[in-house]
Amino acid sequence: MKRRKFIQSAGIFGVAPLLTTAMPASTIEDIPVNTTTRKLWLNYLQKLAEPVLTALAADLLKQKMPVEAKEPSLINDRAKYTHLEAFGRLLFGIAPWLQAEHTRENERQLQARYFKLAIKGIENATNPAAKDYMNWGDEGGQPLVDASFFAYGLIRCPKLWEALDSKIQQNVITALLKTRKIKPPENNWLLFAAMIEAFFITINHPFEMARIDYAIKQHQLWYKGDGIYGDGAEFHWDYYNSFVIHPYLYDVLKIAVTKDDAFEPIRKQTLTRSIRYSQILERLIGADGTYPIIGRSITYRTGAFHHLANMAYRQQLPKELNPAQVRCALTAVIKKVTDAKEMFDENGWLRIGVYGHQPSLAETYISTGSLYLCSAILLPLGLPETDLFWSTGDEDWSAKKVLKGSDLHADHAL
């Protein structure tokens, strides 16, 4: 019943009939579970994307998007950054789906609509004459973070870059180059600088390999064991290995190898560590879709499982994890989080919290735009329905299996 309720309530924007019209209760149970589940994921995508993309495409994002922060006194400062946060983070989560081929007709209609809105959004975000022109490095250090999410989105969806005319492409390059004057601190931020340079590699634009090389070398030094990196020299109990470190590090390496094969041994080693960390993340998902509320930036909600979603999307899950159980685990997380009231305001914008509206959970750097990192869980929508991730029947994930009395193999460190 919860799944049915979510499907009926989530698609509210009148874009694609199949996604916005509730299916008759008498027939919904006859539909293969994977098809129904994909619709649930698409409705979550639609809830996140619709207000951001439509407002930005109309050059009205700064006018329409509220700026919520932990405390009212922080709003003026966070307003300098929040719009690029919203766009960059949303884009990097939905990019594989925008790139995807072989989608069904009704899904393809929504995909085509959002692709066009994203193109117009990129134009406005990078055009200095537009009202929604964003802060790419003119003020503060935060733009480095979200310019990198934006660049990561273009890496994940090359069709977006290819669809831009030459003037807009140059605007994008100019915007991203502004971030080079921002000196990243000695932590995961090094990877933000590296990702932007990796994007330049993919478009055959002059790049600074030193930024890539330094980020990789430092993270090699910060590895703590059993698939976990320090966020800098120190270990922190949070989800930054998933939010940023593992996905960024591997994808930067994959691109860097095309220019210097000396990175290949590190790429292979990083993949082994990434596989292990995906096992850990899957085991953190409780039988009811809950997960430990620990560490900073917890209000990124479902973004805590960026890495697990990315490994599923890249089809690099460990052999011990069937794609179906990962799909079911991630679906349980989505359902649990979206079941809460007050996750969105009356106009469809995200509100601070994990389960509903909980502004005290935020750090001082969190604002409305920050929250759209939650879209990272949606990466597997880039896989076709015929992929094992979507095409196989439901399977319990580790926590659910254990609590049903199943006899699992013992978990081992790397």
Q: Residue spans of the language-model regions?
A:
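C-terminal segment of N-terminal export signals and the immediately downstream linker at the start
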Residues: M1, T20-L42
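N-terminal export signals
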Residues: K5-S26
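Alpha-helical solenoid scaffolds in large eukaryotic transport, assembly, and signaling factors
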Residues: V52-K64, N106-L110, A118
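CBM-like carbohydrate-recognition segments
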Residues: T54-E71, I75, T126-K131, V333-L414
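N-terminal domain-start signal
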Residues: L61-V67, S73-N106
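Aromatic-lined, polymer-binding surfaces characteristic
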Residues: I94-P96, Q111-L271, R283-A309
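Long, repeat-rich segments with strong aromatic
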Residues: F235-L350, A362-E385
